[in-house]
């Protein structure tokens, strides 16, 4: 993980929002570690909203509407699912402190979810933080094929419609790169972030 990181003795929701506004975000070493540290990558993952790409096969799946998509319906369930250990994700950086902080941000109107439902079953989702005209994606999970991908498609559509200018993915992965995610040097990211923070806080 290239970039700076520093431990924090204590974080409040207001401090957390301030950190996002200057390019920091929190992580924990593991779910069982109560400590949190700040991360500021040298290369920041950004998914340009005007260059979002989906494959033909995924576009076809989206048109079939295999899941009901809901927004901000089950925040606690989404963040709990994102924190679960799976075969592809044997450890998690989401500890109880982070879960509590983001639940408070949800109550404040700054944390949001996109959820895929199959009947009464939550089968995929993602959560993140909105501030100014920026959305900071935190984590996602999937229990059915393409569920989290479809949530991402709906997230981008919603952000575009609401006038958001920045979708921050923190880091890039090969998975996110297929959607158009790029690595942005810290100095260039700071300019994108500053512009997004000058905007009034947009309603998600």
From Swiss-Prot:
Enzyme class: transferase
A cellular component annotation (GO) from this entry: cytoplasm
EC nos: 2.3.2.6
Pfam families: Leu_Phe_trans
Domain of life according to the entry: Bacteria
Subcellular location: Cytoplasm
Molecular functions per Gene Ontology: leucyl-tRNA--protein transferase activity
Catalytic activity: N-terminal L-lysyl-[protein] + L-leucyl-tRNA(Leu) = N-terminal L-leucyl-L-lysyl-[protein] + tRNA(Leu) + H(+); N-terminal L-arginyl-[protein] + L-leucyl-tRNA(Leu) = N-terminal L-leucyl-L-arginyl-[protein] + tRNA(Leu) + H(+); L-phenylalanyl-tRNA(Phe) + an N-terminal L-alpha-aminoacyl-[protein] = an N-terminal L-phenylalanyl-L-alpha-aminoacyl-[protein] + tRNA(Phe)
rRNA-binding recorded as keyword: no
GO terms under biological process: protein catabolic process
Gene3D superfamilies listed in its UniProt record: Leucyl/phenylalanyl-tRNA-protein transferase, C-terminal domain (3.40.630.70)
Keywords, sorted A to Z: Acyltransferase, Cytoplasm, Transferase
Primary location recorded for the protein, binned into one broad class: cytoplasm
Primary role: Functions in the N-end rule pathway of protein degradation where it conjugates Leu, Phe and, less efficiently, Met from aminoacyl-tRNAs to the N-termini of proteins containing an N-terminal arginine or lysine.
Family: Belongs to the L/F-transferase family.
NCBIfam families associated with the record: aat
Designated name of the protein: Leucyl/phenylalanyl-tRNA--protein transferase
């Amino acid at each position: 993980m290239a970039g700076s990181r520093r431990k924090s003795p204590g974080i409040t929701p207001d401090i957390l929002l301030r950190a996002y506004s200057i390019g920091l975000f929190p992580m924990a070493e593991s779910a069982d570690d109560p400590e949190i540290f700040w991360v500021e990558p040298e290369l920041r993952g950004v998914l340009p909203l005007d260059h979002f790409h989906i494959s033909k096969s995924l576009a076809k799946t989206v048109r079939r509407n295999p899941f009901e998509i809901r927004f901000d319906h089950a925040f606690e369930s989404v963040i709990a699912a994102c924190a679960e250990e799976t075969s592809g994700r044997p450890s998690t950086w989401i500890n109880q402190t982070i879960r509590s902080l983001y639940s408070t941000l949800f109550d404040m109107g700054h944390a949001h979810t996109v959820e895929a439902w199959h009947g009464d079953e939550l089968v995929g989702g993602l959560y993140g933080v909105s501030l100014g005209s920026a959305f900071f994606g935190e984590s996602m999970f999937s229990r059915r094929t393409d569920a989290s991908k479809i949530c991402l498609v709906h997230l981008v559509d919603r952000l575009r419609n609401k006038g958001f200018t920045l979708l921050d993915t923190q880091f890039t992965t090969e998975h996110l790169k297929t959607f158009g995610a790029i690595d942005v040097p810290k100095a260039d990211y700071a300019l994108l972030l500053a512009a997004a923070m000058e905007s009034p806080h947009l309603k998600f």
